[in-house]
Amino acid sequence: MMRLSSYLRRFRWLVFTGWLLALVPAIYLAMTQSGKLTGGGFEVAGSQSLLVHDQLQEQYPDQGAVSLALVAAPRSDASYQDMNDAVALLRRIVSEFPGVSEVPNPTQLPPRPDRPYGVSLRLDDRNSVTSDVAKQLRTKVGIKGDQAGRTANGKVRLYVIGQGALSAAVAANSKHDIAEAERWNLPIILIVLLAVFGSLAAAAVPLALGVCTVVVTMGLVDLVSMHTIMSVFVTSTVSMFGIALAVDYSLFILMRFREELRSGRQPQEAVDAAMATSGLAVVLSGMTVIASLTGIYLINTAALKSMATGAILAVAIAMLASITLTPAALATFGRAAVKRSVLMHWSQRSECTQSLFWTRWVGWVMHRPWISASAASTILIIMATPVTSMMLGNSLLRQFNSSHEIRAGVAAAAQALGPGALGPVQVLITFPDDPNTQASSPKHRQTIGAIRNRMLQAKNVMSVAPPQFADNNCSALLGAVLSVDPEDLGARETVDWMRTELPKVPGAAHVNVGGPTALINDFDDRVAKTEPLMLVFVALIAFVMLLISIRSVFLAFKGVLMTLLSVAAAYGSLVMVFQWGWLENLGFTHINSIDSTVPPLVLAMTFGLSMDYEIFLLTRIRERFLQTGHTRDAVAYGVSTSARTITSAALIMIAVFVGFAFAGMPLVAEIGVACAVAIAVDVTAVRLVLVPTLMAMFAQWNWWLPRWLSRALPAVDFDKPFPPVDLNEIVVLPADISATKVPCGDLRMVLKLAAKLKNLAPDAICVADPLAFTGCGRNNKRSDRVLPGAATQESEEDPAMGKASDSTAALTAAQVGPVTRTNGHWTARNLVIGLTHRNSITRVMPWSDRPVHPFTLWRSRFSVAIDALEAHIAVQADAPDQPNYQRCSPVETAHVQLPTGDRLLIPTGAETLRLVSYLIMCRNSIRDYAELADMVDAIEPETAAVVLTELDRYYSCQLPMRQWMATQLVRRLSDPHPVDLTEDQWSDPDNKAEWQDVRQRCLSVAVAMLEEAR
C-alpha cells in the first residue's frame, strides 16, 4: 500500500484526469438512462412459472405477448360522449406507435359513463423494451408524476397500466426518492463531517468522493443494463450504499492521515502511513462487503442478482475512489484538510487522543463482564424476537402510495374487467408420455376437461376459459380468472392448491401452474429455501476475512456471531416497523408482509458493513496488544481511541439509510430501516459492550491461532507496514494541545515574528528543547496586580504536571507575556489576560485557571528574542561607549511540527533565558527583570541557574576573565537596580509589594546560580 500511495502522490494529476474522464461520460449516462431498467426479473430458473412463461412466448403468441393497457375512468359527471371521445383518443394514441396494436376483448362492454373502459395492447419485436413504450404512452396521455392524465374537459381520467408501466413508474419514483433522500442526506453528512474534522476542506473530501462514487456507478449500471436485466431498484441501492461507503472509507483514511501528521510525520509520510493502515483496512473491508454480496448470486434470480451487481459496483467504486483519489487529494490539499476552523469549537479534540468517557465506560463494562454481556445480549434477543412473525411477500404495486395514478389505474381496470383479470392463473397441460399425439385429440380432451372442472372447484376462481392449444398442438392452456387481486395472499393459496390437486386428476397429463401470482410465489419460495445456504456462505466469508485481518480464531468467530445478532435485530425491526405498523405515524407504510428481496439484501449488506467497524476496532486493539501485551489495556485503548471515528462513520451511514427510509418506496424504506438499525446496534451494543466484555472474559484466548493456520494465512499486518517516526530534535505538539484552538492573534504574530527572527539571526542552529512547553499548564497566579514598572504574578507549579525540566510533563505555570506603556509607567500583564486559549470548555473558567496555549507562550519568547537581537544591533551602532557584549555562538532554535505538517522555528526556552539575561546586562530595565522573574515561575530557579551559569559560553565582554558574564548577572539579580525605577513608583503600596516579589524571585535565581557554580 505504501508503494501504491507513493505512485498515487507522484502522479496525482494523472489520477485526477483519469477520474475526470470516467466522471464526464458517467454523468451523461446517469442523466440519460436508456430506460432498460425493469420492474421484473423475478423469474426462477427451473420453476413451473418460468416454464409456463417460456411456452407462452414460444407457442401461444396471443397469450404470451408482452402487453400494456390504457384505461379511461369516468368521473361522476361524465357522459357517454365523454367516454366515447376518451376511448377514441386512446386508440388514436395507440395508432401513433409502430409495432403497438390493440387486442380486442369480446367480454368487455362498450364504453359507458358508469364504469371504466380498458384498451389492451400488444407489442411486437420492434418494441422489446416495454418500459420505453410505457414512458412514451404516459407522456402522450398526459400523466405527470403521480397524477393521472385527463381529457380536454377533465371529465375522464386516463391511465397506463401493465408491467412496463409499473417499471416506468418505479423508475420515475426512484429518481424522485433519490433526489429527496440526497436533499436530506448531504446536509446531514456535511454537518457530521464538520463536527468531526472542524474544517470545511476536510469535510469536502469525503463528500466529493461520495458524489463521485454514485455518479460513476450509475453510469456503469446503465452500461450493464444494456446487456442484462437490471432492476429499477438498483438506482436506489447504488445511491444508498455508494455515498455511505465512499464517505466512510475516505473518513477512515483522512482521520488516520491527521493522526499521523500530529504524531510528527511529514505530509507525504503521513499519507503513506494512512494508506498502509486505514487504506489497507478499507481494501479488506471492501473486499469483505463484495464477497458477502456475491452470496446473493446463490439465489439465482435476475432481480436480486441485478441489485447485488449494483451494490457490488458501488462498493468497488467506493473502495477504488478511496484508495486512489484520497491519497492524491491529500497530497494536493492535505494542509488545508488538516487546518481546523477557529469557528468550530466542537471539534477541538484530536482524533488520536483517548476519550476519558470511553476509557471509563470500557473499564466499567470490563469490570462487570457478565452483567454487561447479559444486558446487551438480552436487548438484542428481544429486538430479534419478532423475526418469528415475519411474513414474506412481493408486490410492485404496493411500492406506490394509494393516491398514485398507477394504483388508481389498476383499480379502474379491475373495476372494468374484474380484480383477477389482470393476472390470470395459467395452467399448461402437456402429455410427455404420448409425444406423438396431438393435445387437441379426442383422447386428451377428456383429461383437459377434467382438469378444467377441477380448477373451477378451487377457492377464489371466478371462471376458467376454454382451452387454447399451442401452435404445434403439443400442449393446452387453461386460464383461470380469480376473484381477488393477483398479489393477494388468497391468490397464492389458490396457486398452491392447484399445484397440489391438479396433478392428481386421472390421465397421463403433466400440469404446470404459472401466471403472475405463481411467478412471485416461486420467487419467494426460492428465497426462503436458499437464504440459509447464503447465510452460511456469507458467515464463512466474513470469518475468513476477519481471520486474515485479525489473526485470531476466537475474535473472528466472535465477530461473525455478533454480526448475526445485529442482523437478527434488524430483521426484528422490519416486523415491528412495517408488519406491526409501530411507526406508521412517522410515515412508514403498514404492510402485511416484508418484501422477499429485503432479507437477503440486508443479510449480505449488513454483514459486509459491520466488518468495517470490526476490522477497524480490532486492528487497533491488536496493535496496542502487540505493544503492551495486556489485553484489558489494549481493549480500553482501542475502544477509546477509535470510538470517535467509528461513531462518526456510523452516524453518517445511519443518516444515509434513514434518509432513504423516509424518502423511498416501501422496499427501499425496508432496506434503509434494517441497515440503519443493524449499524446502530452494531456500534452500540456490540462494539461498545459485547466486544470489550467478551475480550475481558477470554483474556489470552483472544489471540490464539494455531501455528499451521498462521503459516497458511497471508501476511497482512497493520502494526508494522511503515517505519516509526524519527523525530530527532523536532518538537511535536501533544495531541491534547494540538487539538485546541490557537488564539488567532498569537498565531499571526508568531508567524510574523518567526520570519523576522530568521532575518535577524540567519545563522541560527536547531537543537532539542526540553522546555518547549514549559509554561503551558494551568495558571494559578494572581492576575490583578501591577508592578511599579513591570508586572508579574505568583506562580505555582501544578503537581499533576511533574517537573518543569521534563519535556513531556513540564506543562506548569503560565508564561508572562508582553508589557505595555501607560502614562509613562511600564505595566506587565499575565498572558492569561486576553491571550489565553478560549474554547467551549475554558470559556466558563476563571482567567486565573485557564491553560496557556503554546503559541501564546512562544509569542512571548519571540518578543524577548526579537527585543534582544534588536537591542544588540542598536547598542553596537548607537552606544559604542557601553560594554561590548559579543555573541559567541549562534542563536539556538527548535523545530516545531505543526498539526498541518508545517515546521516552525522557535527560540528554545534556554535561549530565551539567555536573551532576557542579556537585556538585563545591557539595558537593565524593570521590564527585563519582570520577564525573567515570570520565566522563573514556569521553569523553577534551579533550572534557570543551570542555563545561566553557562552564559559565558554564549556572550563575552572581558575576554581574559572567565565567567565574567555569569558573575555580573548574579550581582545584578541579587540586588536589582533598574535604571527606569523612580521614586514616584514607590508611593503605591501595591507596586512596592510587586517589585519586592520580583526582587525575591531574581534573588532566588542568583542564589541558585551560586549553588550551581559550586
From Swiss-Prot:
Keywords, ordered alphabetically: Cell membrane, Membrane, Transmembrane, Transmembrane helix, Transport
UniProt signal peptide: none
GO cellular component entries: plasma membrane
Subcellular location: Cell membrane
Similarity annotation: Belongs to the resistance-nodulation-cell division (RND) (TC 2.A.6) family. MmpL subfamily.
PANTHER family: MEMBRANE PROTEIN MJ1562-RELATED, MEMBRANE PROTEIN YDFJ
Designated name of the protein: Probable transport protein MmpL11
Species of origin: Mycobacterium leprae (strain TN)
Gene that encodes the chain: mmpL11
